[in-house]
Design a protein with these regions (language model features):
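Bacterial Sec-dependent N-terminal signal peptides
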Residues: 1-26, 218
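Charge-biased low-complexity segments
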Residues: 20-218
Length: 218
């Protein structure tokens, strides 16, 4: 009986997702109440999916058409892998999980990932964001206003670490949030990452104070 109920819940969930009209179609602009996103394709991540052994799904890139800078397409920024983010008192994963709380079950069942591409200015403020998701019903059912709220909260609460070490006006960073494991496991892992983020935040604050102190002596 229990197995029958679980199967019924699964098919109802899948049916609900498949019955919804997809928000994101290649080459089109999808409109929300607060903003609109242009939808394009990035073929790079198809290879990554094959390597990871997950079902091959086309990647969907969402870019806010109301961005003030339009730097992603013009490539007027310094791209360097491994740029650290200041994620305290709130982490990027915490922001994403909170806004996608209602969709967590479907995202976890499908073992999906979201890539968040960011541009920061010389002060470390995040000024432009684009999302990379998979062409999967669980993502397709999420309205653009949800991504907009994630984008706005990231801009308010996340900063780039040590932006002064770059010569360019804008610096690129990327992070990914995965939905691998149970919801409980994801939240427990996020708490551990938050503690590490706190330690790094304190380290970065102390390093900045020491540098300012050295510069004041010159």
């Amino acid at each position: 009986m229990k197995a029958l109920l679980l199967s019924l819940l699964f098919f109802l969930s899948v049916g609900k997702l498949l019955g919804q009209q997809p928000y994101y179609k290649y080459g089109e602009t999808t409109h929300g109440k607060k903003t609109s996103y242009h939808v394009s394709q990035d073929s790079l991540f198809v290879i990554m999916e094959k390597i990871e052994g997950h079902p091959i799904m086309k990647p969907v890139r969402l870019q806010n058409i109301n961005n003030k800078h339009d730097l992603f397409d013009n490539k007027k920024f310094q791209r360097k892998n491994g740029r650290m983010l200041l994620e305290y008192p709130m982490t990027t994963a915490e922001i994403v999980y909170r806004h996608l709380k209602q969709e967590m079950e479907e995202l976890v069942d499908a073992k999906l990932t979201i890539f968040i591409h960011m541009l920061a200015n010389r002060q470390g403020d995040i000024v432009e964001i684009s999302f990379l998701i998979w062409d999967h019903p669980a993502w397709q059912a999420i309205p653009p206003d949800t991504f907009y709220m994630i984008e706005q909260e990231i801009k308010k609460k996340i900063k780039l670490a040590d932006p002064e070490s770059f010569n360019e006006d804008y610096i690129y960073a990327v992070t990914d949030i995965s939905f691998f494991g149970t919801q409980k496991e994801l939240l427990e892992e996020e708490k551990k990452m938050k503690e590490l983020s706190k330690e790094f935040y304190i380290y970065e604050q102390n390093r900045r104070k020491m540098r300012e102190k050295r510069e004041s002596r010159k």
